[in-house]
Amino acid sequence: EIPLRLVGSEMCIRDREYTGYVAHVCDMKSYFDENLKLIDEKNLNALFPKKNPVYTKIRDDNPTRYVTGSSVSNSLLADGCVIEGTVENCVLFRGVKVKKGAVVKNCVLMQDTVVEAGAELDCVVTDKNVRITADKKLSGTKSFPVYVQKSHIV
């Protein structure tokens, strides 16, 4: 739909129908929900189809490292992560570190978040460069996830 203020202007307006995966992200809950939906491979492939690759800023990093004794289930992890603890039903961005004894469930952890030993997170969204210190417990709900601001230490 073309906005009425542009009709009759000197602008050249074109449109193209898009029938692929769409998500309406308007608040923290929808951001949380839509990220966790990407754990389902069907949704991930619909958003990032192989025939139309999405090119992003390159950050050459090591593959994710799973240390002996770690546990990961039903999660989507980017490169550069180091997992020593437990991760369940999460989306982890590049460079996230989950230390030994830490438990992370139903979370979206952005780039370079560090979850130190013994910390427990459930229904948490962290912005990038966040540090959750040892033995801290943060718990939200699926309808009201906890959000930690960029570069904060909790």
Locations of the language-model features?
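Single conserved hydrophobic/aromatic residue that forms the stacking wall/gate
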Residues: 1-8, 12-13
